Every structure is written in C-alpha cells, then in structure tokens.
C-alpha cells in the first residue's frame, strides 16, 4: 500500500467514525428527552410555510400525522412575495428587528382543546419567521400550563437562535420540550427523522 492509498483509506475510516459518533450523540440526546404522556386527539401542530409545497409544510404534515394531531396553518395577513429574492427583501429587516407581521385568525383553532402544541417554522436569518413570532406572542397566555415544542427547517445553519427565542417569548408558564432542526433540502426524504421527533417526545395514549 503506497502513501496515497494509506491516506485515502484513513480518511474513509475517520469519516465513518465521525458519522458513527454523530449518530451516537443523536441517539443519546433523544434518550435523554423526557417523554410527555398525552391523550389521543389532544395535540395540535401549528406552522407557517412560505410556499404551498414548502419544507416546513411537509414537516408539519408528517409530524401531525405521526402524532395524530390536528393541523393548523399560520398565514400572514399580507402574504410574502412569491419571488424568493423579493421575499428576502421583505422578511430580512423584520427578522433582524424581531418585528411582528400581522397574521390572519386561524379558523377552527381553540387552544383550550389541546394539551400539547407543536410549532413549526422555517429558520429565517437565525430566528423564527415573523408570522410565527406573532402567533406565539399573541397566544403565549393561552399556552400557559401546556406542553409546547418548536421544530424548524433550515438551510444549513442548524438550530441557531430559534429554540432560545421561542423559549424567551413563551416564558416559564408552559413546559417546553427540546426543539428540533431539520435540514430543508433533505426534509422531504426524512420521514423517519420527522416521526422520531414525535416518538422521542410524546407517548400518545
């Protein structure tokens, strides 16, 4: 075996070891999550997605199906531009300024009916999408005494500030489960990971 082959083979070994370590850490983190017992029909998934076939919509739909949850969509009163660059021009200053964007009432959603609320958002510039921030801010009193959790789709930045800022808005009146970030580019082929988000956190009776 020459030097070049040795280096190549060692690189492969290190890569596999790193992958295994990552999976081990992921499994260990999941095993440390305290599951919440919830009755069937007492979970709601509330989400915002920029586009009709968006990653966050897919994630929310998959999670709701696994949890046997009711599914509700947050919609901006004035929708963001469907052109990506123009949407960025609108949303970026809102995100950096932690501004609230007006949203429509969610038809049929009565939070009093639910014990667990899972909130879905895209990660925009490291934080919640403004319509999600608006909804959480408007409903933080109604979420008191409930179990809540945020999940997000992202473009590569991971969780960033989303989980932290969600917890800051909610405060200590609700039980907050560990957040979860899903890579947007692969979320539509990550059904098992989306389902594990539910089974790691909830024990549906």
Regions found by a protein language model. Give the residues of each.
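C-terminal segment of N-terminal export signals and the immediately downstream linker at the start
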Residues: 23-53
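Short hydrophobic segments within beta-strands
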Residues: 46-48, 74, 119-120, 151
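Helix-loop-strand module that forms the ligand-binding subsite of alpha/beta enzymes
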Residues: 86-174
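Glycine-rich phosphate/pyrophosphate-binding loop and the adjoining helix
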Residues: 14, 175-205
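A short beta-strand-loop structural module common to alpha/beta enzyme folds
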Residues: 69-83
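Solvent-exposed loop/turn segments at secondary-structure junctions
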Residues: 50-53, 76-79, 123-127, 154-158, ...
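A short, Lys/Arg-enriched amphipathic alpha-helix followed by its capping loop at the start of a domain
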Residues: 59-67
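N-terminal export signals
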Residues: 5-26
């Amino acid at each position: 075996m020459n030097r070049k082959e040795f280096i190549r083979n060692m690189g492969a070994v290190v890569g596999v070891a790193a992958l295994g370590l990552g999976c081990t850490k992921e499994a260990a983190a999941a095993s440390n999550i305290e599951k919440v017992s919830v009755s069937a029909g007492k979970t709601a998934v509330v989400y915002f997605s920029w586009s009709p076939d968006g990653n966050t919509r897919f994630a929310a739909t998959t999670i709701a199906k696994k949890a046997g949850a009711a599914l509700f969509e947050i919609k901006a009163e004035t929708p963001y531009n469907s052109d990506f660059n123009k949407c960025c021009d609108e949303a970026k200053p809102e995100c950096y300024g932690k501004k609230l964007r007006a949203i429509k009432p969610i038809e049929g959603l009565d939070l009093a009916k639910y014990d667990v609320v899972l909130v879905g958002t895209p990660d925009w510039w490291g934080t919640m999408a403004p319509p999600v921030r608006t909804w959480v801010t408007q409903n933080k009193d109604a979420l008191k005494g409930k179990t809540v959790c945020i999940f997000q789709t992202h473009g590569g930045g991971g969780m960033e500030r989303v989980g932290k800022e969600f917890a800051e808005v909610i405060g200590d009146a609700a039980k907050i489960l560990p957040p979860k970030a899903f890579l947007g580019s692969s979320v539509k082929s990550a059904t098992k990971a989306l389902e594990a988000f539910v089974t790691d956190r909830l024990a549906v009776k």
